[in-house]
Amino acid sequence: YLDIANYREDDPKGVLKQISILTKTIHDNVGAKGAIKHYIEDHGSVPLWVLVNYLTIGNLSYLYGALKDSEKNIIAKYYAEKYMKQYKNSKILRINSKDMESALKIFNLVRNQCAHDERLYNSDYKNIRVSNIANYLEITNYNNRRIVVAILYLKILLNKDYYKKFHSELNA
């Protein structure tokens, strides 16, 4: 993940920025007690699956955007297959890299709204792609400018048990 060759070729500046963020995250946490320190001291490097726990949602969104399309589609396919398996749904869920980018964008927007005490209702998410997910879930009465868009993506991406808990707490 620190090798520029593993990312898109059309935006070298953006890719270098992402690699810089990853490197800085490792640097900032290498002295602290935790997984990064352990992996650096005991293994000489930090696996990506450890590093992502130290990244912000925005960092993850931009990192995903810097990946090659083939890698993005592998990730999207993984989540589609996981959803179909957990919900025992034989209908094929076709989500692609654009859907995943939209999910990460809306999660970042919602997180920032919450962190800065902004309202979530009637928020404008007009540039978020959701029709593919809504059609699959057979939801016809939705508006791209509502928080329900984030909830639709959570249903697809979260483990079923986590989503059920989230949904029940939301309704409480």
Predicted region positions:
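Long, contiguous internal "core" modules enriched in hydrophobic/ aromatic residues
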Residues: 1-172
